[in-house]
């Protein structure tokens, strides 16, 4: 199978490495210097240092060439750009008249200014296309690149897209599940990043494992309430893309969003944290959108409110936790 992966960050590189073991895989990056470096070193030192890339993986800086690689009906395109770059890539595909027959995206979050989920952006930019979906689940790029076991879900309204994605990814140590609840999968992937910041704050303050368990559990309730309000199915949030992704991102030491929370608890400013991080922390990007949508829909999300208060309103992390503890008692 021919597969094109658009985006050579950590996640795009890891997925391309997995795909190249079995398929004719092309990894596209906008930065020609990075493409040249990848071809020579067989390693993405910028985003995934120390991981040797498969000898069969090829690299490309020209987007039209990369898209042409995935045009056939038996091919697949994987968009591994962050949420902020998804719309632009869809426009580029449309303008080049090279929209792949089947494609999936792996970004998580809401578009900051429009509050759109990824599938809404895709539908707006490519209204005549139907065979697309989202691939998501509890996964750290480095572990995937190292060939460690992982389980992901592809959600799409198109059976052809689900089948093509399954055929591409389901091999080696990667297990793929399929479904059609695109909204539920995307909401889970967005909200878990915000909740991971909360868990990082609690852990950074030394509040203990009891507090962590409470935050994860009540955070899952917030995620589910919002997802159902937006049209997702409740059962999706107890699966890989809801509870599974939340547990990993909230507790795993490779989580960028958890790291933001830990550093906020240590007294560092958000600007300094993001500058030092050097990579995307989607929980920071989409926290405002999540809270805004929740308020608009009448969905109670106190943990998300507390995170936004710390990130954007200057509330001290310990004061935000105290505010949560002072909330009125209620039935679970």
UniProtKB/Swiss-Prot annotation:
The keyword Lipid biosynthesis applies. The active site is at residue 192. Sn-glycerol 3-phosphate binds at residues 108, 137, 139, 192, 245, 255-257. The keyword Kinase does not apply. Keywords: Cytoplasm, Lipid biosynthesis, Lipid metabolism, NAD, NADP, Nucleotide-binding, Oxidoreductase, Phospholipid biosynthesis, Phospholipid metabolism. GO terms for cellular component: cytosol. It is an enzyme of class 1 (oxidoreductase). It catalyses: sn-glycerol 3-phosphate + NAD(+) = dihydroxyacetone phosphate + NADH + H(+); sn-glycerol 3-phosphate + NADP(+) = dihydroxyacetone phosphate + NADPH + H(+). It is found in: Cytoplasm. NADPH binds at residues 11, 30, 108, 141, 256, 280, 282. One of its GO terms (biological process) is glycerol-3-phosphate catabolic process. Signal peptide: none annotated. Gene3D superfamilies: N-(1-d-carboxylethyl)-l-norvaline Dehydrogenase, domain 2, NAD(P)-binding Rossmann-like Domain. One of its GO terms (molecular function) is NAD binding. InterPro entries: 6-PGluconate_DH-like_C_sf, 6PGD_dom2, G3P_DH_NAD-dep, G3P_DH_NAD-dep_C, G3P_DH_NAD-dep_N, NAD(P)-bd_dom_sf. Pathway: Membrane lipid metabolism; glycerophospholipid metabolism. Catalyzes the reduction of the glycolytic intermediate dihydroxyacetone phosphate (DHAP) to sn-glycerol 3-phosphate (G3P), the key precursor for phospholipid synthesis. PANTHER family: GLYCEROL-3-PHOSPHATE DEHYDROGENASE (PTHR11728), GLYCEROL-3-PHOSPHATE DEHYDROGENASE [NAD(+)] 2, CHLOROPLASTIC (PTHR11728:SF1). Belongs to the NAD-dependent glycerol-3-phosphate dehydrogenase family. This is Glycerol-3-phosphate dehydrogenase [NAD(P)+]. It comes from Burkholderia pseudomallei (strain 1710b). The gene is gpsA.
């Amino acid at each position: 199978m021919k597969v094109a992966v658009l985006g050579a960050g950590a996640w795009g590189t890891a997925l391309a490495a997995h795909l190249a073991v079995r398929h004719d895989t092309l990894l596209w990056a906008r930065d020609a210097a990075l493409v040249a470096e990848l071809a020579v070193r067989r390693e993405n030192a910028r985003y995934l240092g120390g991981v040797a890339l498969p000898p069969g993986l090829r690299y490309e800086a020209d987007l039209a060439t990369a898209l042409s690689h995935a045009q056939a009906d038996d091919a697949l395109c994987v968009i591994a750009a962050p949420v902020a770059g998804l719309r632009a890539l869809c426009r580029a595909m449309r303008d080049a008249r090279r929209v792949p027959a089947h494609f999936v995206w792996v970004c998580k979050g809401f578009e900051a200014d429009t509050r759109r989920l990824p599938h809404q952006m895709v539908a707006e930019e490519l209204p005549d296309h139907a065979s697309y979906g989202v691939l998501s689940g509890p996964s750290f790029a480095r572990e995937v690149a190292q060939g460690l076991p992982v389980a992901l879900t592809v959600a799409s309204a198109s059976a052809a897209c689900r089948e093509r994605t399954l055929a591409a990814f389901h091999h080696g140590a990667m297990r793929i599940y399929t479904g059609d609840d695109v909204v539920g999968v995307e909401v889970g992937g967005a909200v878990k990043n915000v909740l991971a910041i909360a868990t990082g704050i609690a852990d950074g303050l030394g509040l203990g494992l009891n507090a962590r368990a409470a935050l994860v559990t009540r955070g899952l309730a917030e995620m589910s309430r919002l997802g159902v309000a937006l049209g997702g199915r409740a059962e999706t949030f107890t699966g890989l893309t809801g509870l599974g992704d939340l547990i990993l991102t909230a507790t795993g030491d490779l989580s960028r969003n958890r790291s933001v929370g830990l550093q906020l608890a240590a007294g560092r400013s958000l600007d300094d944290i993001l500058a030092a991080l050097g990579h995307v922390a989607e929980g920071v990007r989409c926290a405002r959108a999540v809270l805004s949508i929740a308020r608009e829909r009448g969905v109670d999300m106190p943990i998300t409110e507390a995170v936004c208060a710390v990130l954007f309103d200057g509330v001290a992390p310990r004061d935000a936790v105290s505010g949560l503890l002072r909330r009125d008692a209620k039935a679970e």
